[in-house]
Regions:
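Generic N-terminal amphipathic, Lys/Arg-enriched alpha-helix
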Residues: 1-12
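N-terminal glycine-rich anion-binding loops that anchor highly charged ligand groups
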Residues: 16-47
Length: 120
């Protein structure tokens, strides 16, 4: 899934990124919050590894393609932060058979269609 990075370039100061991650994870205001960072902006396994190294195990992404990309790189608890498309139920189900995949729904009809289709 290299296509996720075709349209952007990034310059990342890894030392600063590590400091920012550590600051959030040690901030007492967030002590009782389950931290699930959104990986839409960086779309980078290298940056994702900074989060993993800091103990983060759950992530949020913006599409099925991004979920597949990060799942293929060892992330196994992923939330897709857009409403699920029932037309992609087969693809969601395949991925959910490999990882802990969470989906959002925005209507009772979508929920019903997904519940009747998804097995995992």
């Amino acid at each position: 899934m290299n296509s996720l990075n075709q349209h952007s370039s990034k310059i990342v100061c890894f030392a600063r990124a590590e400091q920012n991650i550590a600051q959030i994870l040690t901030d007492t205001r967030f002590a009782k919050i389950s931290f699930r960072p959104h990986f839409k902006t960086h779309r980078s396994i290298a940056v994702a590894e900074l989060f993993r190294k800091a103990g983060v195990g759950k992530i949020t992404v913006a599409s099925l393609a991004m979920a597949e990309y990060f799942a293929a790189n060892g992330w196994n608890d992923i939330l897709i932060a857009i409403p699920a498309n029932p037309a992609l139920a087969t693809e969601y189900d395949e991925l959910a058979g490999k990882i802990d995949l969470s989906l959002l729904v925005d209507s009772p009809d979508s929920l019903s269609l997904l519940l009747h289709t998804l097995k995992n």
